[in-house]
Amino acid sequence: MSYEDRDTYGMYKNYDEKGPGPRLMGADTLIGDDVYNQNDEDLGDIKDIMLDVNNGRIAYAVLSFGGFLGMADKLFAVPWSALTLDTVNKRFLLKVDKARLESAPGFDKDSWPNMADPTWQNTIHTYYGTTSYEDTKSSKDYVTPAHRNDESFIPQAPVGTDHVKREWD
């Protein structure tokens, strides 16, 4: 099932057509989306989306793979940056062979890892060949503590960046 099939509010019918799909999407419409690889192999579907609430970013999509009728599925936290939205086929693409996904670090539904643990994050990003968004230079480096209590101050992201970090976080 695709995000358009779950669009009960009609959010996506008139998106701006400037990108590969809607610019903003409801997280609940992504749950259940299929994930395929470049060989058109079914890798499973998205079971959950993990948000980094401190940074306002999507950190991981939790992918379910390998079970039968939802039983004995293995779960995998895939870095959001490793996924690409395929708007033609209404699914996500992950550039990983099925055999490699089968041997990826995973977990079961009753034993989730601590996804905030930097060692765990490094393992996952290394496995999928991605860089954590926390490791990329951003406007987060340009806000000083002097602005901490100034409610009128609205930090601006420098050109080429997408978010603002407060130094006191």
Where are the model-predicted features located?
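Peripheral interaction segments used for macromolecular assembly
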Residues: 1-169
